[in-house]
């Protein structure tokens, strides 16, 4: 293995101002962890502080040995107080998830909904209410395996619930993949479309929606 977890190293977040891209990076120590994928990061201002809020799928550790690694990241939030030079962090949920995505039009600004991939399901978080709902695939004994869900808005001015989530889903019955389309306004309902693909796509397959 090219790299391995070490308890001798810590973890930190770096903040570079967007209005000063050649300026210094401010570093903030956080509890040891590993992050592959970020949901979103937004700037917030209160009466007495300038804040940066980062939300991501967090592993408590990874690559400690050469064996197989579990799918055990959980959604986490870090609030960086730039004024006081401190960081607070909290766990958002206990579900094991990965590949968090929001409506791409809202990257860097507050988004209400974030969708993640769990085992045999998609999990959508309502970041305003602090709740979550699931869309399952397949059966309990042979669940389908979804990949990262991408939001396709119904039109350029559509809200976060006016559009569809697109996910490649592995079908273990036929050993192939489908492109599954879910109505964002009925997340737990049946898919509105399912397109069989001529071959299986690997798990973790990334994608983006580009309007034609």
Regions found by a protein language model. Give the residues of each.
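Beta-propeller domains
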Residues: 1-212
């Amino acid at each position: 293995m090219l790299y391995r977890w070490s308890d001798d190293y810590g973890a930190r977040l770096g903040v570079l101002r967007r209005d000063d891209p050649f300026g210094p990076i401010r570093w903030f120590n956080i509890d040891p962890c590993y992050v592959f994928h970020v949901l979103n990061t937004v700037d917030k201002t209160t009466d007495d502080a300038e804040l940066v809020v980062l939300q991501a799928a967090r592993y408590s550790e990874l690559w400690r040995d050469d064996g197989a690694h579990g799918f055990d990241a959980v959604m986490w939030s870090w609030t960086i107080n730039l004024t006081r030079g401190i960081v607070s962090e909290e766990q958002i949920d206990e579900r094991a998830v990965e590949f968090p995505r929001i409506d791409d039009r809202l990257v860097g600004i507050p988004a209400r909904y974030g969708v993640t991939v769990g085992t045999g399901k998609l999990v959508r978080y309502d970041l305003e209410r602090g709740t979550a709902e699931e869309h399952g695939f397949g059966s309990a004994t042979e669940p389908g395996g979804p990949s990262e869900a991408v939001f396709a808005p119904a039109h350029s001015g559509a809200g976060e619930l006016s559009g569809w989530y697109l996910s490649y889903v592995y079908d273990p019955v036929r050993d192939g993949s489908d492109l599954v389309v879910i109505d964002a306004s009925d997340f737990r309902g049946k898919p509105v479309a399912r397109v069989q693909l001529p071959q299986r796509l690997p798990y973790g397959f990334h994608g983006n929606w580009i309007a034609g």
